[in-house]
UniProtKB/Swiss-Prot annotation:
Name of protein: Putative lipase ATG15
Membrane topology summary: Single-pass type II membrane protein
Organism: Candida glabrata (strain ATCC 2001 / BCRC 20586 / JCM 3761 / NBRC 0622 / NRRL Y-65 / CBS 138) (Yeast)
Name of the gene this protein is made from: ATG15
EC numbers for this chain: 3.1.1.3
Reaction(s) this enzyme catalyzes, per UniProt: a triacylglycerol + H2O = a diacylglycerol + a fatty acid + H(+)
Length: 504
């Protein structure tokens, strides 16, 4: 009898221990145990890749393909055959995973944000165009803002941060599938040759949808570069490099006279035409303009869904810029400092709201020179590769893993790769990095930026004022002259009628 009681007691102890371990493991997987709202359930209704969007900057054409079940199978088989290659390992953290079929689990939380009342994409593009042409007048416009409670990614939850990082890595994935691409550019008046299929050179976005919760996540592809940034794949290198050098350099990637600049805004030593750079950023064949199209087309496909943004490297910076433009949440990974291009684009910010209170979170670690803004100088890896990564300042909040002290890492460009961030940072830390206000910094402090448009107006006003003063002085002189020498009248004439005597 006593032996049976001991056996039962041992079974109870084992059961309690199992439950304790299970609860601890569940809390650990949730990061800090935050009780955010789940955006996935046991039936697998989470986020799946539903569309791939591509943009051709040469013809200013965007196209989209729906990810069908047939495409999932063929694309996952292609990835499986490439398992173990440098290509796969550079963008996907789990070799052999199925990125086209994977169901992502994200958690959300409520957050009060200030955003524009009119967030219609057409209205926003008109405002940005106007602010670039007339920045002084744009500052006088009183935009209408609203405070709204929205659902944002719970960045305190490790699984949520991990899922967004995997989505960002997913955006690097190429597929051999070339059928059923739809042209989405007809509304922009495109009349040239339509290109369908996989376009290697341009911006790409992977669109993940949760049809139950009506949330859409747009993951924007980062920089592709052979042996430099993160993907190991050579697609989109040319345009990625142009946009990197335009967005994150002080002046068109003018490092020295040996460099070929990406725009003609350089004036002289450490002097740059500010209006020229701003206009270059908004050109229709640049990536920021492409992200505006991407957002517009996704909102047309899912008008009743909330939009979240994510991306790695260049893709993260573009996600942050797009998030500020429309007031939607953005979570980035190892993004270069994007505060300078945000200011150059004159993106709206609620009056009195510090930029660190926006719904933008930048995750990164201090062994990545691009995220830290230290990959510059003639001998840096970025400069040797032809990249002018001169910005360090971020908008929103700053979430940094201290791998230098915690893991003994040294600053190295290889640490920028997305798969290393996922495998050796996010997965190895028990909790996500704490998000806080970004350090105070100033980009390009030693440069002089000339506002030629403002100078021309001031010169014109000065010229008009000088002309008015000269005219006024001339009139006063004439008045004084006529007053000092009043007109004389004739007081005597000869027999012919000619005046011979004058008097006052």
């Amino acid at each position: 009898m006593l032996g049976r009681q001991v056996t039962m007691l041992l079974k109870v102890i084992v059961a309690v221990a199992v439950l304790f371990v299970w609860h601890r493991s569940r809390d650990s997987s949730r990061g800090d145990g935050s009780n955010g709202d789940g955006l996935s359930d046991s039936s697998g209704n989470g986020f799946r890749l539903e569309h791939i969007w591509a943009y051709d900057p040469e013809d200013v054409v965007s196209s989209c393909v729906d990810v069908s079940e047939e495409m999932r199978v063929s694309a996952d088989e292609y990835v499986s055959m490439e398992s173990g290659s440098e290509f796969v390992e550079s963008w996907w953290a789990k070799t052999g995973a199925r990125p086209f079929s994977h169901v992502f689990d994200l958690r959300s939380r409520s957050m009060d944000i200030q955003r524009l009342q009119d967030r219609d994409p057409v209205s926003m593009e008109k405002y940005i165009d106007f602010s670039l042409e007339n920045p002084e007048l744009a500052r006088t416009i009183e935009l209408e803002w609203e405070t709204a409670k929205i659902q944002v990614p719970d960045v305190r939850n490790r699984n949520t941060v991990l899922a967004l990082a995997l989505m960002s890595s997913n955006a690097y994935v190429r597929t051999p599938y070339t059928g059923d691409w739809r042209n989405l550019s007809s509304s922009w008046g495109h009349t040239g040759e339509e290109k369908f299929g996989w376009d290697k050179d341009g911006l790409r976005g992977h669109i993940f949808v949760n049809k139950i919760t009506k949330v859409v996540v747009i993951a924007i592809k980062g920089t592709s570069s052979q042996g430099l940034f993160g993907s190991g794949e050579e697609d989109t290198i040319t345009n990625d490099k142009i946009n990197d050098n335009l967005l994150f350099s002080c002046c068109c990637a003018r490092i020295s006279y040996l460099w070929t600049t990406v725009c003609d805004c350089y004036m002289k030593s450490y002097t740059c035409d500010e209006n020229c750079v701003e206009a270059e950023l908004k050109r229709k064949d640049r990536y920021y303009a492409a992200t505006l199209k991407l957002y517009k087309q996704v909102t047309e496909m899912y008008p009743d869904s909330a939009i979240w943004l994510t991306g790695h490297s260049l893709g993260g910076a573009l996600a942050a810029l797009l998030g500020r433009t429309y007031g939607v949440p953005a979570v980035t990974f190892e993004a270069p400092g994007e505060l300078l291009p945000a200011k150059r684009l004159h993106l709206p910010l609620p009056p009195g709201l510090p930029d660190y209170e926006e719904a933008i979170w930048h995750f990164g670690h201090n062994a990545d020179p691009i995220f830290m803004g230290t990959c510059n100088g003639a001998s840096s890896s970025c400069s040797i590769g032809g990249y002018a990564m001169e910005t360090a300042c971020h908008s929103g909040q700053y979430c940094m893993y201290d791998v230098v002290n915690d893991k003994g890492w040294r600053v190295n460009l290889l640490n920028h790769r997305i798969h290393r961030v996922i495998d050796e940072v996010i997965l190895e830390y028990g909790r996500p990095a704490k998000c806080q206000r970004a350090p105070t910094c100033i980009d390009c402090y030693n440069w002089k930026f000339v506002n030629k448009r403002r100078n021309r107006r001031e010169e014109s006003s000065s010229s008009i004022a000088s002309s008015s003063q000269l005219t006024s002085s001339h009139s006063e002189s004439e008045t004084l002259t006529s007053t000092d020498a009043p007109e004389k009248t004739c007081i005597g004439r000869n027999w012919l009628g000619i005046c011979t005597d004058y008097g006052v």
